[in-house]
Amino acid sequence: GSNAKMLSGDVATTLGGRFLIQDVYPYSFAEFCAASGVQLTAPDTLSTAQRGELLNRFAAYFKFGGFPESLIMADKRGYLTGLFQRIYLGDICARYAVSNSYSLRIMIKKLAESVKQPISYNRIANILGAVGIKIGVSTVINYVKYAEESWLVLRLQNDAAKLAEKESTPKYYFCDNGLLMIFLTDPATSLLENLVADAFENWS
């Protein structure tokens, strides 16, 4: 459901007593297969037809991600676009009183295009300025923070890097390949790295 009213960071200040926070992610590939009625077994035990079905399932998961409802949607891209518009973009704007949703959307698109490399907040601000969107670096930082707190993107950092490098050029990935896919025209390598990052975050 909507996260505009409460995010996980608000629980401690809203609920009294003891509580346990459990993060829920989109399906892993194993969960996706189970929900699709496909059983994962050792590759050498699969028939040719079963291998073909498994490859088809992975192709769908790789491109459209693991949101449960997307499994039954004929227009998966339309569903994911609507999900982004209604839940993520709408919730971020409502929760954080973002008056210019266009600038936020373009910033998120730039995050999608940068998913394979560390981002520079200054560079994003300059890129947006070049297309007529005048926002400061502090606003870009806030927008990225809003997207992270709303579970649209997740941040992974190089623990071996120096502190200044960690903070100034972090790497961000989308919480699901399906959400990343709607922003990209040539998505293959970006989707692959994003899928690995999601698996790392979900199981770390």
Spans of model-derived segments:
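Interdomain motor-coupling "hinge/lid" segment immediately C-terminal to the ATP-binding subdomain
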Residues: 4, 8-118
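Accessory nucleic acid-recognition modules appended to NTPase machines
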Residues: 71-204
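Acidic active-site catalytic centers that drive phospho-/nucleotidyl reactions
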Residues: 1, 31-34, 176, 193
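Short gly/ser-rich loop at a beta-strand->alpha-helix junction or flexible surface loop bordering the NTP-binding
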Residues: 1-2, 7, 197-199
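Residues that form or immediately flank small-molecule/cofactor binding pockets and catalytic motifs
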Residues: 2, 26-29, 158-160, 177
